[in-house]
């Protein structure tokens, strides 16, 4: 029975990934995205992001993503699916399949103002969704280590410290 449950969960995650990847394909480049696509990014890189918003990691992801379409679409899908996946791991749901669908449904009914600032354009997405995913991983690690007193594998601990550092950039 456990194999069937895992299989259903895997299929749901693949469907969520495909949905968000397709959304990424349909989403056109907007104002900031087009700026990063132009020579603006080389000017900003020359001065080390000095006049920018301080979201260095998101801006670097944005620069790469606007120049490599397939990577932009795939990262849009993976980060979006990763947020749902991390929420499920934080909550430690027993009925995984139904909760994945519930979390996905709730993500789809975001208020339009929040959607416009995050999922509605790639600059906002890489600045906010990426940091949300990193924050969720940090919360997941802390809950497991502090509340449940679970010993984390070395690789997860290293990832925790790396993401904690880069999450501030």
Where are these regions (language model features)?
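Extracytoplasmic catalytic/substrate-binding loops of multi-pass membrane glycan-assembly enzymes
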Residues: 22-40, 49-60
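Short juxtamembrane and helix-loop transition motifs at transmembrane-helix boundaries
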Residues: 34-42, 60-67, 91-92, 139-146
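Short hydrophobic/aromatic helix or loop-helix immediately within or flanking a transmembrane segment
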Residues: 48-80
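Transmembrane-helix motifs of polytopic, lipid-linked glycan transferases
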Residues: 77-99, 137
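Membrane-interface alpha helices of multi-pass inner-membrane proteins
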Residues: 155-169
């Amino acid at each position: 029975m456990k194999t069937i449950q895992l299989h259903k969960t895997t299929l749901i995650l693949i469907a969520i990934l495909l949905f968000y990847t397709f959304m990424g394909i349909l989403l056109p480049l907007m104002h900031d995205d087009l700026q990063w696509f132009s020579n603006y990014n080389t000017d900003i890189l020359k001065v080390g992001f000095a006049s920018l918003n301080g979201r260095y990691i998101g801006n670097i992801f944005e620069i790469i993503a606007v120049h490599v379409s397939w990577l932009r679409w795939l990262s849009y899908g993976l980060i979006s699916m990763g947020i749902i996946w991390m929420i499920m791991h934080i909550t430690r749901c027993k009925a995984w399949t139904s909760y994945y669908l519930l979390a996905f449904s709730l993500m789809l009914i975001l208020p339009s103002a929040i959607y416009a600032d995050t999922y509605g354009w790639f600059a906002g997405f890489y600045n906010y969704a990426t940091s949300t995913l990193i924050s969720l991983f940090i919360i997941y690690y802390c809950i497991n280590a502090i509340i449940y007193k679970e010993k984390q594998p070395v690789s997860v601990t290293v990832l925790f410290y790396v993401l904690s550092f880069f999450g501030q950039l």
